[in-house]
Amino acid sequence: MSTQVKPGNWDTAAAITVNEICSQVEQMYSESEDVETQAGLNEEAIELEIENNFDVLVDILFHSEENKVEEALIEQIFFHIACLSMRGYSLNAEKTHGNSAAIIYDTVLGKQRMYGHGNIARFEIPGIAIRLNDKLERLKNLRRWDGPVLFEPMKDTWLDICGYSVIAIMWLREWFLLNLKNQETTGKPTGAK
């Protein structure tokens, strides 16, 4: 899962992360006849698996008595949540995994351009977990009401869950604070004079 590649910018780091997730999703949900694999074809089953993984993550981050939390385990959990949510997005949006990966990449890149590093850097992984909890609760609420609530489509929620998981993986790999590609040469945000 964790790669030895050292990206030079945020864009490349996000692309590497999203492509790893997409490759894993395509392996998990190939044209297999395996009943275990096919169980993941249902959005409700995917949501339940994400919730189970997220509960473990919350216990590790907020209820563990150990001083040193195992970052490799945390990355593994976020990676699994990212795979599951990419699959959920693909099913809900009726897109291929490759098309979903491109949309997820464009979304996280666009959000990074809008928000910068500060919104994640201040609270790090615990902050990402809290944001992810908000999205999981929204997913439950959308399912409870069987559709969009206040114009929030379910596919956007799947996209957000995957996006925050991608960001968490990048943070754990120490890639999140890299400059965007268009900031490499000047060190200034786009449009800065």
Regions found by a protein language model. Give the residues of each.
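Intrinsically disordered, low-complexity regulatory regions
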Residues: S2-K193
